[in-house]
Amino acid sequence: MLAPPVTENRVTPTLGWPRNVEVDPRIGWPTVPRETLDWPKASSAGVVPASPSDTAAAAPMIEIPPGPRRARFDEDEFGSPPVEEDPPTGLLTAERVTTASLPAPPLPRIFVVANQKGGVGKTTTSVNLAAALALSGLSVLLVDLDPQGNATTALGVDHPPGTPGTYEVLMANAALSDHVVDSPEAPNLKVLPATIDLAGAEIELVSIVARENRLKRALRAYLQDHHADYVFLDCPPSLGLLTLNALVAANEILVPIQCEYYALEGVTQLMRTIDLVKGELNDELRLSIVLLTMFDARTKLAAQVADEVRRHFPAATLPTVIPRSVRISEAPSYGQTVLTYQPSSAGAISYLEAAQEIARRGVEEIA
């Protein structure tokens, strides 16, 4: 008598775990005993599915702490090393990141970093240039005028709601020196932090007399008693009263322009505003620096945009361009600039070269 054919028992997903599982060696299952997972049991009635409550209790979700993890960028989930950026050939090398010294200007240079178009790298440019100059031995102050406080975060300064800073200086006539804090990014770098409280300042300033001069008075009083070679005013992506205060307080404008389509969008309106401010409120104001950001050498568009910008601003545009860089994007999530996060990266070296050009131009123009 022939034995009946052996049929393979298949278990559908709704009936629990199958008895025989082929495991892909590249992925693998967690090393958990079968008993823990309550595999299906044979009975006269067929296969008894696992209890959902038992299965859930046996395989709890692993809680991942919030925030970035450095290992996430050092090695991906398949163990492949990250793609390294090629450092540009230029004025600086990685070994000279913190040792290069730059000439100090005879008078404080106050830059407003502005562009009406958002996403062009205003805050990134502000914090990295400030850090580059400070790491080169110069004294630098950064004033955060953006209610989002991204510049404050990128320089490693905590700023929960209620933290005294720019809002108190503008709205309560507080002394700027009372609220300036040291940044851990460089020994010579100080920050006037911004919080979400600053969001209401645009409306509150409307009813104040001489509202456009609030920051100028506070900054001049600070510089009389405290030394600073460079001051950077990081503005929100709009031409409101906060940006107007910065334009009145500054003597130079630094415009970051991304090397992408619509790159000059917003610059035309900014130039009109500059002319109005120069004519009525601040005759010392001038556009001195244009910095090309997010440059992708793989595309023709980036080169075309760079040529177009240099044609419009031949004297102001720096030779150095800031490349599109993963390291530059990652650094703020660690409360760092790219110069301390990855000092040998192309982005860090490019910002150092830009800072060197800015410092040398300042001395040459005075001479």
Region spans (language model):
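P-loop NTP-binding core
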Residues: M1-A367
